[in-house]
Amino acid sequence: MTVKVKFPKDIREYARKEKVKDSLIKLTETALAEAISKFHRRMIVLQGDTLNKAKLAGILAGGAARILSEYIPEMLERKLRDTEQIEVLYATDALGEDTYGRKRFEEFRKHFSLLAPTAELTSVTFKHSRDILGRTFDILVIDLSYDYSPNDLGRIIETVRGGGLIFVLTNPFEKWKDMWTGFHKSLVTPPYTIEDVKKRFNRRLIRKFTEHKGIYIVNTDRMSIERKPGKYRSQATLPEREKVEIPKNIRFPRELYELCLTRGQVEVLKTLEELIEKEGMVVLTADRGRGKSVSIGIASVGLAVSSKKKRFRIVVTAPEPENVQSLMKFAKKSLEVLGYKTKVITDNGLIKEVYAKGIGIRYYPPTKGYRQRAELYIVDEAAGIHVPILHRYLEKERVVFSSTIHGYEGAGRGFSVKFLKKAKEKREYKEVHLSTPIRYAEGDPIEKWLFDVLLLDAEPVELTEEDYELIRKMEVYLEEPDLDDWFENDREDLRHFVGIYVLAHYRNRPSDVALLADAPHHEARVLRLKNGKIVTAIQIAKEGGIPKAVIDKMAKGYKPPGNIIPDMMVKHHYAKEFARLKGYRVVRIATHPDAMDMGLGSKALELLIKEAEEKGLDWVGSGFGASPELIRFWVRNGFAVVHLSPTRNPVSGEYTAIVIKPISEKAKEIVKKANEEFRIRLTEWLGDTHRDLEPEIARWLFESPFGEAVNYPIYLTKTQKRRLEMFIKRILTYDTVVDAVKPLVKLYFLDGWMRPYLDERQIMLLIHRVLQAHDWKETAKLLNRTEMYTMVELRDIVRGLWYYYKHLIKDEEGEK
């Protein structure tokens, strides 16, 4: 079906009155005709210094909205949209009174509302852009004139459906490429100033506007087109969606299959039908915008209504409730299509719970969801959740894991690399991959532009057998890349560098790239093979060297931007002099996923420490989510643990650990003392603040690179000593001598390298039963032993420790 794409006569006359050239109207008509015909998006960049750009956006968007509104019935029939309302989104950095962002919005709205009064206009600030996740818009106006973050850019652009237009408001490119934005101001940290902040990311963004198809550029101050289409057009052919055939022998209601827009979604429903009568696990992967969450929302209702149970409870979890809004909305829609009355519970505008007769669907944070009883568990955006927590869901009878491969969620393939490999060892599962976009057709140029500018689809370099030989021989070198060259000339090395993070890390946000590009204290290091291939990527932040006046403020509670390690040392160890010292904080370190466990990470750290030493720095440190593997990695590389956060990260479920490798003599003195203090604190925290800390993590936190015992006197009364002897001789039980055993166990963990040898299981037993005071049943389960065996083993360990340490323990008179 061919349709006319021409501005109505009244809008053309209005535009001329407002001095809008016909060429700009033709440009908009052409962009819209291209978008409709291909079911893609098109972008028009309006660069300028005055309110003209907002006025022009209002007039052109108003005309486009009127054209789209004429063809809503045909688009609904072809399933190109699911609403009769034309929806327009205006996104900006600020909407407060007297802000420039507000003035531009008001100028836009004045013209737009006059020309397209029936369109629904939503305004949102970047800060609240998560509020529009799960919604879809026909037209987007995004104001980048002053402030934005790359995370916002990705999240907002992807809400526009095929056949839609995106208007981008910017400053004149020549001015913009040298401007500092609000995002830049947030990167300033002592001792740096705004003058030190780079502008690489904005320059990359400007360049990418001119490199990709489907993007047109207008200078609104001169009302001239600077990048125009090859051919103007005023007609479009309404496309047809791929015909989706409903399979025979379906078990979910047919009405649910009719909600599917792609064959991939049908496959998801068909796969989940297998969970009606038997337990099982399904893994769903897709790029952003492929209808993954929608499919799960529909299929979860299919399972609930097909179940023989009177009550069907569904637990939904994801890193953030925003991640599951599409799932919840389509679960609600599916229930209503089947004739159910629904009850929805929201929090801050986000759907948290959906109920119908006998069916309950509820969102829980990752650390709480697995504790609930349910018939089905759904883990959405699983790559953003800490692997040990994913393993808790792995134990459930019916569970669905889903993960975005590329997109602003930034999952990467780390989910497959780190979790699914281990999951295969525990249970069988079916995997479904969705490749066809839902909001727009394949090959959308705006998606290509977005993935390119934000490096969402970056991949590491491929490794050959010759490369592995170089790795085995450790023929590598550490290099500081020229970031100006990487970003200005769009080097492949940048994609390979970021690609390592995309594949190796659980979450990789677009703003991480901007931080690397522009933050004055952030730098990159790469471990290259002799042939130049990047195999390990390191992002570092230079910290310390803080002026005395700022340090005094820090000691009173002030938190400077950046400087995470100096700030922690000042507040938790009263080491004000440490903040004057300079060091590298390793922000991220990751090795090529095809070359893991070959010693590259340790080699990269070794060379980084050597570089820091040569540059006269005082320390190298890092902060990270504590897992047994990571703690072990850092400790084995000679780093001392100096801090553990009192609470777990609500998304990852991990405690944050901070480690430091001192280089200068002054740093060694301070860090040694901080490490000793931390170990003393940990012996107490394990029974209180960190009672739920995994013992396999705790045991590595006690390890020290200094090898010396902590000078921390342990006292036992004469009676306690006698009772301890009676426990060893099996006269008294453990529960009656806890007060005497605990100081002895503390002494062991505060000892140096000369402490008696205990194997891994024995160390875990001391931590779990004595320091964390868990009962015999839990401890025996942890160790995979009987309770009786565990009791006997603890007595044997205490006997050995007592004979080894009793000459060091003072009694109340101070005698040994």
Swiss-Prot record:
InterPro entries: Acyl_CoA_acyltransferase, GNAT_dom, NAT10/TcmA_helicase, P-loop_NTPase, TmcA/NAT10/Kre33, TmcA_N, tRNA_acetyltr_TmcA. Residues 469-664 form the N-acetyltransferase domain. Keywords: Acyltransferase, ATP-binding, Cytoplasm, Helicase, Hydrolase, Nucleotide-binding, RNA-binding, rRNA processing, rRNA-binding, Transferase, tRNA processing, tRNA-binding. Its EC number is 2.3.1.193. SUPFAM superfamilies: Acyl-CoA N-acyltransferases (Nat), P-loop containing nucleoside triphosphate hydrolases. It is found in: Cytoplasm. ATP binds at residues 265, 439. GO terms for biological process: rRNA acetylation involved in maturation of SSU-rRNA; tRNA acetylation; tRNA wobble cytosine modification. GO terms for cellular component: cytoplasm. Pfam families: GNAT_acetyltr_2, NAT10_TcmA_helicase, TmcA_N. Acetyl-CoA binds at residues 589-591, 629, 636. GO terms for molecular function: 18S rRNA cytidine N-acetyltransferase activity; ATP binding; helicase activity; hydrolase activity; mRNA N-acetyltransferase activity; rRNA binding; tRNA binding; tRNA N4-acetyltransferase activity. It catalyses: cytidine(34) in elongator tRNA(Met) + acetyl-CoA + ATP + H2O = N(4)-acetylcytidine(34) in elongator tRNA(Met) + ADP + phosphate + CoA + H(+); a cytidine in RNA + acetyl-CoA + ATP + H2O = an N(4)-acetylcytidine in RNA + ADP + phosphate + CoA + H(+); a cytidine in tRNA + acetyl-CoA + ATP + H2O = an N(4)-acetylcytidine in tRNA + ADP + phosphate + CoA + H(+); a cytidine in mRNA + acetyl-CoA + ATP + H2O = an N(4)-acetylcytidine in mRNA + ADP + phosphate + CoA + H(+). The keyword Cytoplasm applies. Catalyzes the formation of N(4)-acetylcytidine (ac(4)C) at the wobble position of tRNA(Met), by using acetyl-CoA as an acetyl donor and ATP (or GTP). Catalyzes the formation of 233 N(4)-acetylcytidine (ac(4)C) sites in RNA, on the middle C of a CCG motif. Modifications are found in rRNA, ncRNA, mRNA and tRNA. More acetylation is observed at 85 than at 65 or 75 degrees Celsius. Belongs to the TmcA family. This is tRNA(Met) cytidine acetyltransferase TmcA. It comes from Pyrococcus furiosus (strain ATCC 43587 / DSM 3638 / JCM 8422 / Vc1).
